[in-house]
From Swiss-Prot:
A zinc finger (AN1-type) spans 79-128. The keyword Protein biosynthesis does not apply. This is AN1-type zinc finger protein TMC1. It comes from the Eukaryota. May have a role in protecting cells from metalloid-induced proteotoxicity. The gene is TMC1. Zn(2+) 1 binds at C85, C90, C109, H112. The modification Phosphoserine is found at S43, S54. Keywords: Acetylation, Metal-binding, Nucleus, Phosphoprotein, Stress response, Zinc, Zinc-finger.
């Protein structure tokens, strides 16, 4: 072979191989999962499924190494400040000592610290507990001796 552009063509079909490597991400654009072989140290090969979302390509980064391909999706969630009031429209700071709600586990400012003011989910169960406690207290205070008739 003296010319660089000449390529030797094998005579049998079994010897024909594809020379150019395929991009695994390009092949699976329309599939919902991609099975990647991940080799662990001396323990064998593990087959794992990695879900892909072809629509979220603008918010994700793709890294591929050797035998495994991974797709990492960044989640953009809105985090509240640690000491801000948990009420939706309030932006004031939560009270440190009196702002904790035991029923919904929220931290509220002095305006929204009461269960009625922040529309607590545990308001009905709290009312039932207080009603039962008052009934038990009244029953314990009642006199048990029969009344004397004159």
């Amino acid at each position: 072979m003296s010319d660089i552009n000449e390529i030797e063509i094998p005579s049998r079909k079994d010897e024909i191989r594809q020379v150019t490597p395929k991009d695994p991400m390009h092949e699976i654009e329309d599939k919902s999962t991609y099975h990647a072989k991940i080799k662990k140290s001396d323990s064998g090969t593990v087959l794992g499924a990695i879900p892909l979302n072809s629509r979220s390509s603008s918010n994700s980064s793709v890294t591929s190494t050797g035998q495994s391909s991974r797709r990492v999706t960044k989640k953009t969630t809105k985090k509240k400040k640690k000491n801000a009031c948990y009420f939706d429209t309030c932006s004031s700071a939560a009270s440190k000592f009196i702002g904790d709600c035991n029923f919904c586990k929220g931290h509220f400012c002095s305006k929204h610290r009461l269960m009625e003011n922040h529309a607590c989910n545990g308001l009905t169960s709290c009312k039932e507990q207080l009603h039962q406690r008052n009934a038990d207290k009244l029953e314990a205070e009642q006199t048990k001796a029969p009344k004397i008739q004159i």
